[in-house]
Amino acid sequence: MIAYARITGQALDNRPIKRNRSAGLLLFRRKPRLEVLLGHPGGPFWRRKDDGAWSVPKGEIEDGENELMAARREFFEETGYHPTGSAIPLGSLRQPGGKQVFAWAIEDDWDPEKLISNMFSMEWPPKSGRIQQFPEIDRAQWFGLELARKKILKGQAELLDRLEQALSSPPR
């Protein structure tokens, strides 16, 4: 069954296999020190979480989509903004939950006050029968690298190191 699922993308009972891959963009600016833009997840689970809760705006890669296309689409869906500039590849990493994340960095100076996030629905409170909508990202903010290392999800912290390394390497 595993081989069948890998080839067809479906389990034997025709259920689609959940893809465990996502892609995202890490915006950065130099004002004059290096800062990165992180998003805080929306919804009741994340409401009171701060340190270790912020994320690179990212999401699932759709069928037929390459990783960079997915990263750009997801950034727009979660922020309402299309960043300009060239994408610097940061590679991929595997988060503690097993999801593989592909990431790029783009230099841009977007105003997070203009955040317009897409929404998701969930039953809240649990077992209440009430379906409520929440933003995927409830706020976005620029952080210097030292503070960003405290704010970002532990499984994504390596992306900050990769960005620093990419920016300090001579151009090819």
Model-flagged regions — what are they?
Residues 31-34, 43-46, 62-63, 81, ...:
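Short, charged/polar surface micro-motifs in flexible loops or helix N-caps
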Residues 11-56, 104:
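N-terminal strand-loop-strand
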Residues 2-6:
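Alpha-helical and coiled-coil interaction segments, frequently adjacent to or embedded
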Residues 130-149:
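Alpha-helix-centered segments that form part of catalytic cores
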Residues 145-172:
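Charged phosphate-binding loop/patch that engages nucleotide di/tri-phosphates or the phosphate backbone
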Residues 56-90, 144:
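The catalytic Nudix box helix
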